[in-house]
Amino acid sequence: MAAAPSESIPSVNKAWVXSEYGKTSDVLKFDPSVAVPEIKEDQVLIKVVAASLNPVDFKRALGYFKDTDSPLPTIPGYYVAGVVVKVGSQVTKFKVGDEVYGDLNETALVNPTRFGSLAEYTAADERVLAHKPKNLSFIEAASLPLAIETAHEGLERAELSAGKSVLVLGGAGGVGTHIIQLAKHVFGASKVAATASTKKLDLLRTLGADLAIDYTKENFEDLPEKFDVVYDAVGETDKAVKAVKEGGKVVTIVGPATPPAILFVLTSKGSVLEKLKPYLESGKVKPVLDPTSPYPFTKVVEAFGYLESSRATGKVVVYPIP
């Protein structure tokens, strides 16, 4: 079956839309009748159940990468979890009714989709999606894709392997919470250290950190211990390079990077989510939701305001989406 009955897929849907660049509180508007996207041969149409917000969303709204952005108006939202309601003719991995999740944009900063996940329906390339782990709710699944894929790609680039030590800068954030878990449970790190503020140290330990460093009280770069890998998720490579062993690796997702640190931007792949599925299904790797999540669809602007305040611990999720 290639599609749900066409009468059950409307021609328009509710969505949050940005028609100009600026602060999310100024430019994001609710629109009850945006056209539902048409799918290409290698895409599926998803009935969105939950979506998660990411700093890249508000940076995009501010026009930080407008030179490579897709043309306005756009619907924000990179992370999606939902149900397939239609499949393109070349799609082989999914069928109508499948529960899926993923990061809609293969490359975050270059021509991201105009039809993001903050809508009732979105179109997604088959290759960026994975089957939702059965033990995860849609809210939990929506919190994962870009964050857990970024954590995984950085650890691979840093060549973390069993027996090596790693220091995570920003361990309580959306990406950092997954770096700790993957380093410990997937890559087999011998020691995981991570930084956070005082109130978030217990979270680091719960996630598997052997050493929780309070950055408000001590400077990690001054510690006598050095690490095989330093993963910077906050933008402090000038300090990170002082905490790595000679011959070790420093990776960052926030530029500019102080050499020899490596700055990278994620290439999103559903295959990484499929690879991590056993760890998610066994409970070794867990989603980390901000305590304020989920926000209802009517409160998207408030959800962005909270994310932009840098107070979030884990992911900010929007659910239910009508």
From Swiss-Prot:
UniProt xrefs under PROSITE patterns: QOR_ZETA_CRYSTAL (PS01162)
Keywords of this protein's UniProt record, alphabetized? NAD, NADP, Oxidoreductase
**Entry's EC annotation:** 1.3.1.105
- What residue stretch is flagged as signal peptide? none
Q: Catalyzes what?
A: 4-hydroxy-2,5-dimethyl-furan-3(2H)-one + NADP(+) = 4-hydroxy-5-methyl-2-methylenefuran-3(2H)-one + NADPH + H(+)
Query: From the UniProt record, which GO molecular function terms apply?
Result: furaneol oxidoreductase activity; zinc ion binding
Q: Which cysteines are joined by disulfide bonds?
A: none
Residues annotated for substrate binding in this entry: K59
Per UniProt, where does NADP(+) bind? K59, G174, V175, S197, T198, K199, K200, Y215, I253, F264, V265, L266, R311, A312
Under which main EC class is this enzyme filed? oxidoreductase
The text of the family note is: Belongs to the zinc-containing alcohol dehydrogenase family. Quinone oxidoreductase subfamily.
**Oligomeric and partner information:** Monomer.
Describe its function: Enone oxidoreductase involved in the biosynthesis of 4-hydroxy-2,5-dimethyl-3(2H)-furanone (HDMF or furaneol), the key flavor compound in strawberries.
Q: What is this protein called?
A: 2-methylene-furan-3-one reductase
* Organism, as annotated: Fragaria vesca (Woodland strawberry)
**Gene designation per UniProt:** EO
